[in-house]
C-alpha cells in the first residue's frame, strides 16, 4: 500500500522508539492502527453506498426503458401489476437509501473516539496481554451496542 520495505519500517520504528520512548511507543502504534482501521472502514462504507446507488439508478433506467418500448396501453393486467411492483420496489429502495443516517459522520466520531482514548490504552498496554484482549473485547461489545 505505501511501498515501505522492511528496512524502512525498521528505521521508522527505531526513530519512534528514540522519540517516544519504550512506554509510549505501543500506545502510539495502537492509536495509529485504530485510525487506519477507521479510515479503511469509512472507505468501504463509501464504496458500498456508491455501488448501491448505481444499482438503484440502473434499475430505474431499465424500468423507464421498458415503459418506453412496450407502452403501458398494450400490456396485460398481470404485466401492469408486475411493473407496479417494480416501481414500488425502486421507490422503497430510494426512500430507504435517503433515510439512512450519514455513515461518514459516524465513522468520523469513531476516529475521534480512538484519538481520545490513548490514556486508557496506555494502562492496558502496561497491564499485559490478557488485559489487552479484555480491552479489545470490551470495545467490540461497545461498538456493537452503539450500532
Curated annotation (Swiss-Prot):
<keyword id="KW-0653">Protein transport</keyword>
<keyword id="KW-1003">Cell membrane</keyword>
<dbReference type="GO" id="GO:0033281">
    <property type="term" value="C:TAT protein transport complex"/>
</dbReference>
<keyword id="KW-0472">Membrane</keyword>
<keyword id="KW-0812">Transmembrane</keyword>
<keyword id="KW-0813">Transport</keyword>
<feature type="transmembrane region" description="Helical">
    <location>
        <begin position="1"/>
        <end position="21"/>
    </location>
</feature>
<dbReference type="GO" id="GO:0043953">
    <property type="term" value="P:protein transport by the Tat complex"/>
</dbReference>
<feature type="region of interest" description="Disordered">
    <location>
        <begin position="96"/>
        <end position="147"/>
    </location>
</feature>
<protein>
    <recommendedName>
        <fullName>Sec-independent protein translocase protein TatB</fullName>
    </recommendedName>
</protein>
<keyword id="KW-1133">Transmembrane helix</keyword>
<keyword id="KW-0997">Cell inner membrane</keyword>
<comment type="similarity">
    <text>Belongs to the TatB family.</text>
</comment>
<dbReference type="InterPro" id="IPR018448">
    <property type="entry name" value="TatB"/>
</dbReference>
<comment type="function">
    <text>Part of the twin-arginine translocation (Tat) system that transports large folded proteins containing a characteristic twin-arginine motif in their signal peptide across membranes. Together with TatC, TatB is part of a receptor directly interacting with Tat signal peptides. TatB may form an oligomeric binding site that transiently accommodates folded Tat precursor proteins before their translocation.</text>
</comment>
<comment type="subunit">
    <text>The Tat system comprises two distinct complexes: a TatABC complex, containing multiple copies of TatA, TatB and TatC subunits, and a separate TatA complex, containing only TatA subunits. Substrates initially bind to the TatABC complex, which probably triggers association of the separate TatA complex to form the active translocon.</text>
</comment>
<keyword id="KW-0811">Translocation</keyword>
<dbReference type="GO" id="GO:0008320">
    <property type="term" value="F:protein transmembrane transporter activity"/>
</dbReference>
